[in-house]
Amino acid sequence: MHVGLSVIFQNPGETKPDRDIYAEELVLAKQAEPLGFDSIWSVEHHFTDYTMCPNVFQFLTYMAGCTEKIQLGSMVAVLPWHDPLRVAEQVAMLDVLSNGRTVLGMGRGTGRIEFEGFRVAMPEARGRFAETAEMLLNGLEQGFCEYDGEYVKQPRVDLRPRPYKSFKGRTYAAAISTESAEIMAKMGVGILIVPQKPWPVVQKELTKYRSTFFAATGEQAPAPYCAGWMFIDDSADRAEEMARRYIGAYWDSVIDHYEFNKDHLKNTAGYEFHGEMYDRLNAPGGMQKMTDFYVDLQIWGTPDQVFDKVQTMRENTLADGFMAVCSYGGMPHDEANRNMQQFAKDVMPELKKLTPLEAPLEQTA
């Protein structure tokens, strides 16, 4: 099993200067390769203390210069906020600088504050994502970009530096809609799962995706990658206490950043699932129930419990990759460092021994 590390640069409540958060998170990131992680990841967000990584490719380029062999992943780059030609150039340049170590993760975004900041209408996100992804992925395969869509208009231009190698087999999408699934499948794009839904819902979505992938390509879809907020300790009681404190605090920051406690997403095309959270959060006891549900989806406990929970995630999704988030929710840096190091020592070697699970070759939904 592929095992990665993700750093997310949170500064909840701005309790310290942002530059200190960067210094601390980079201490973690620079240990990823020596500790044996297969990849290092970060996620694009803007304008709040939720996640302060406005240019994930810039961070990964920095990490390319600090490392020799570890893969460099975006979890994710939010395509509707960008000119797709600039994204293609940044990805191609990162891949050349890193000798082909880039793993491209793409998404469409959910934060209203970010869409408004970039002057993009949220109801257009699904269409913009599909068009941008198609132009981007075709460009990275062909070495030139050209597109004539509803949202993306691009006369033919060459990508220089030319792409290092094909991105097929190392591209993932965190948002697959009915409209974009066929485009993604034809491009050979895998699924990147950030746990937030009940596993039966995730399984249903994956079944639909695998069916679409097979119909479009005649091939079996690649195994997904899963992220997870992780806390490990030799004491099961302490692990649970810290998980509920810090993963719970992270979930609070999710609610604040995405404004799930407001009803705007209920009437925004393409965000119906997210809009349902408003009703669940505002039901009697809803906030605590949602917090407990989210925390219980994540990966925490003793080394054996952490291993078992990754196994459960793997069995529910048939994933062949796990990216651990070890620092979040205001967790002290020393605790985050210990958390990461113990996971790398006590659990990661056993995860790497796991062989891929076989997905059913599904031809119909």
What are these regions (language model features)?
Residues 83-190, 199-220, 362:
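Internal, glycine-rich beta/alpha segment that forms the wall or movable "lid"
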Residues 19-31, 90, 175-182, 305-312:
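Short, acidic/polar
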Residues 36, 44, 63, 94, ...:
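Conserved, mostly hydrophobic/aromatic
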Residues 35, 97, 187, 316-317:
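Structural motif
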Residues 3-7, 40-42, 72-74, 102-106, ...:
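Hydrophobic faces of well-ordered beta-strands that scaffold small-molecule active sites
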Residues 126-159, 200-319, 352-365:
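An alpha-helical appendage that flanks or caps ligand/catalytic pockets
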Residues 1-72, 167-169, 361-365:
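N-terminal beta1-alpha1-beta2 module of alpha/beta enzyme domains
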Residues 7-22, 77-84, 165-175, 231, ...:
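Active-site mouth loops of central-metabolism enzymes
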